UniProtKB/Swiss-Prot annotation:
The gene is accD. This is Acetyl-coenzyme A carboxylase carboxyl transferase subunits beta/alpha. Binds 1 zinc ion per subunit. It is found in: Cytoplasm. It comes from Salinispora tropica (strain ATCC BAA-916 / DSM 44818 / JCM 13857 / NBRC 105044 / CNB-440). Coiled coil: none annotated.
Length: 566
């Protein structure tokens, strides 16, 4: 149970998490987070604004919500009397405060709910105020930030309170349609109609540490099911494990996290190509192809591509990119560990990166399912690609997988459909896409992240319709014939450059990437920049048309023309 911020005049407060007696000034200095157990006290709207926005930047929006008592509700008190008491007790007109502000210099419209006001319940006035905030964000083309704290719909307004879920959601939909970013911050508690609408249908969902969120509250669930609930049920950490939120952030880091997201959303950094020419060397297709055409045996290349010392996607994100904020979850119940992705910065430009994650040790590999994505992993990648399209961010994918997860569970959850939807979406994504095969490119699991404007490949990576072992077992049939199958499959970077599947080969430090990971990661950084920069200048319609034409040439007619040209 989360503790409540102490009332004015109290010198001491008892933590609701660990029962420690805390000096109030010390608690305030620690942002109302218990220094003993880390429990986060609830904050009122003014305190939350003071924590999140730049000092002096907040300007309240005009309160144009009319006084409403739509159904003349009376319980032990008439509804208007409850409103009067809530206003007197909080000093607020309603359960939400809306205005314009900046966060680390990035402009936004922000709406902060206050649980003290009738449990932060969603009624007609609250719905109207948040809708007006979204409309202001749309008019100004600045991100909308919503900080939620609510028990759900306001019962005293009957079914009209239910309608606010749709009213605010369609305002969020208008932001999506126009490419205006939206971010929600879930604080404790967020339930019912708020959880099932604007708290979770924004572009990015952040949960403050320990915050609880759900459609039905725990008491209702216990009553209906007659079962005890697991420890940590509906907490932020539970939601993260189950793919419902992008991030769980402690209060002291919340402002910085929000600032990073808003900067990426607004693209408020120096564009690549202006002041970064030294990191964008021209690409000589013939020389890169020639470099990839080494004499190493195909089977030896397969073994190098699988070496556990090769840089992983998280290694690249730490070294080849300037910053990275990981975004989690497919929003449908899972967060696949074999796929990682999020917002990164590359030479001053916000980009979205998504890739397969393996690991360097047996434990890492097992925890990441050896880089074999489940349907949840593919759907996470799909969600992030669509986010990039809405925010106008280029996409970089890093491919290193033996293939998609072939398990029974994956088939039950729609593996084929998940891969198919990724391929379909990437063919028409209205933003530049650069794919890099960094290790293994295994079958449809690889292609699900490799439908791109430019496909690059590390010198000792492989890309194939099937593993050599699988091919040998089916066609020879003898798994020991895997080396022969590797040669026959034409899966090396040199082979794929000649076939036109790969646009350029990224040289590896001798003898291979795992001998000098920093050099390999720097080479990938330079190659991605070299291929991404020209794409940023291509109009969207032309970009998509060229991407489709690129893959159309792999039809029989296109391959026949290539053979004739040779």
């Amino acid at each position: 149970m989360n503790p409540t911020t102490p009332r004015g005049g109290q010198l001491w407060s008892r933590c609701g998490g660990c029962a420690s007696l805390l000096y109030r000034k010390r608690l305030r200095r620690n942002l109302d987070v218990c220094p003993e157990c880390g429990a986060h006290s609830r904050l009122d709207a003014p305190a939350r604004l003071a924590q999140l926005v730049d000092p002096g930047s907040f300007t309240a929006l005009a309160d144009r919500a009319p006084e409403v008592d739509p159904i003349g509700f009376v319980d032990v008190l008439p509804y208007p009397h409850r409103l009067t008491a809530a206003r007197s007790g909080t000093g607020l007109a309603e359960a939400v405060v809306c205005g314009t502000a900046t966060v680390a210099g990035s402009r936004c419209v922000i709406a902060v709910m206050d649980f003290r006001f009738l449990g932060g319940s969603l009624g007609c006035a609250v719905g109207e105020l948040i809708t007006q905030a979204a409309e202001r964000a749309l008019a100004d083309r600045v991100p909308l930030v919503v900080v939620t704290a609510s028990g759900g719909a306001r019962m005293q307004e009957g079914v009209l309170s239910l309608m606010q879920m749709a009213t605010v959601s369609q305002a969020v939909a208008a932001l999506r349609e126009s490419g205006v970013p939206s971010v929600s911050v879930l604080t404790d508690p967020t339930y019912g109609g708020v959880a099932a609408s604007f708290a979770t249908n924004t572009d990015v969902v952040i949960a403050e540490s320990g915050a609880r969120m759900g459609f039905a509250g725990p008491r209702v669930i216990r009553q209906v099911t007659g079962r005890e609930l697991p420890d940590g049920f509906q907490t932020a950490e539970f939601l993260l494990r189950h793919g419902q939120v992008d991030l769980v952030v402690p209060r002291h880091a919340l402002r910085g996290c929000l600032a990073t997201l808003l900067a990426a959303a607004s693209g408020g950094r120096e564009p690549v190509g202006a002041g970064h020419e030294s990191e964008c060397p021209p690409v000589d297709g013939s020389s890169t192809q020639e470099r990839g055409a080494d004499k190493r045996d195909a089977w030896e290349t397969v073994r190098l591509a699988r070496h556990p010392g090769r840089p992983t996607t998280l290694d690249y994100l730490e070294t080849a990119f300037d910053s990275f904020v990981e975004l989690h979850g497919d929003r449908l119940g899972a967060d696949c560990p074999a796929v990682v992705g999020g917002l990164a910065e590359l030479a001053g430009r916000p980009v979205l990166v998504v890739g397969h994650q393996k690991g360097h040790t047996t434990g890492d590999l097992m925890s990441r399912n050896f880089g074999m994505a489940s349907p949840a992993g593919h759907r996470k990648a799909l969600r992030l690609a669509r986010l990039a399209a809405r925010w106008g961010l280029p996409v970089v994918t890093l491919v290193d997988t033996p293939g998609a997860d072939p398990g029974v569970g994956a088939e039950e959850q729609g593996q084929a459909a998940a891969i198919a939807e990724n391929i379909l979406t990437l063919t028409m994504l209205p933003t530049p896409v650069v794919a890099v095969i960094t290790g293994e490119g295994g079958s449809g699991g690889a292609l699900a992240l490799a439908v791109a404007d430019r496909v690059l490949m590390l010198e000792h990576a492989v890309y194939s319709v099937i593993s050599p072992e699988g091919c040998a077992a089916i066609l020879w049939p003898d798994r020991s014939a895997a080396p022969q199958a590797a040669r026959a499959l034409r899966l090396t970077s040199a082979d794929l450059c000649r076939l036109g599947v790969v646009d350029a080969v990224v040289p590896e430090p001798a003898p291979a990437a795992h001998h000098d990971p920093p050099a390999a990661m720097q080479a990938v950084r330079e190659a991605v920049l070299a291929h991404l920069v020209p794409l940023l200048e291509v109009p969207t319609a032309t970009l998509v048309r060229r991407r489709r034409r690129r893959f159309r040439r792999f039809g029989a007619a296109g391959l026949g023309a290539r053979a004739g040209a040779r």
